[in-house]
Amino acid sequence: MNQDIIWAHFQNEGVASFSGATARLEFLVRQLRPGERVLNVGVGSGELEALAQRKGIDIWALDPGERAIEKIRNHLSLGERAQAGYSQQMPFPDVHFDAVVMSEVLEHLDADIRLRSLAEVHRVLKIGGRLIGTVPARERLSDSDVVCPSCGHQFHRWGHKAAFDVPAMTKLLKGEFAIETVHERFFNEWDSVGWGRRATGLIKKFLSSRGLGTYGAARNIYFVARKATEPS
């Protein structure tokens, strides 16, 4: 399965698919400080970059989609701060960023690419710099399998390659970083739904805080990990 084809569609013709991400992205931007140099890996609709820019953050962007990068360069005047490329081979210098954001990215990567990508994050972060991000929580990958009607190939509708729980995410990050937090968190677009759905969301949030309830959209693992030293 070609991940680039899937993401070229969602970031361009299918950009409306990111409309439910605002609560998550606003939360992530609140963790960043004005004046910090921050790299966002995986631009989606460009909403995080826009939110960060309004807060006075020196925001940079990396994404494999050249069309998505061109759009964000033009819309936010990012110039060379927005680059087309891959997380396992970042076109940025060593010790360059105060923080790197990877929200809903790691689940799209094969195991070896995930490890190489985290090594690259470590390389481009300053000492004490933070990796901040999210992945879907305890996703059942088979629930989102679809079949191509033309060729019969079966694949995950969003291109996910891996599912994570808190122990698995902790183990993954420990290889490169000092962990500050790894926990489940529930995001919900309160302003865009009626009272009935708000009540349902509150119930799901309560159950999620206790590791119970349903899986699905808005239920994530949130993580923060810090670069403590240079690799030996």
Stretches with model-predicted labels:
Residues 132-154:
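Conserved class I S-adenosyl-L-methionine
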Residues 115-127:
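A short glycine-rich, Lys/Arg-flanked "PGG" loop and its adjoining helix->strand segment in the class I
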Residues 104-108:
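Short catalytic micro-motifs in class I SAM-dependent methyltransferases
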Residues 1-93, 99-103, 115-118, 163, ...:
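Conserved N-terminal segment of class I S-adenosyl-L-methionine
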Residues 37, 128-130:
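Short glycine-centered segments of the SAM/dcSAM-binding site in methyltransferase folds
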Residues 151-168:
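Acceptor-substrate binding/catalytic loop of class I
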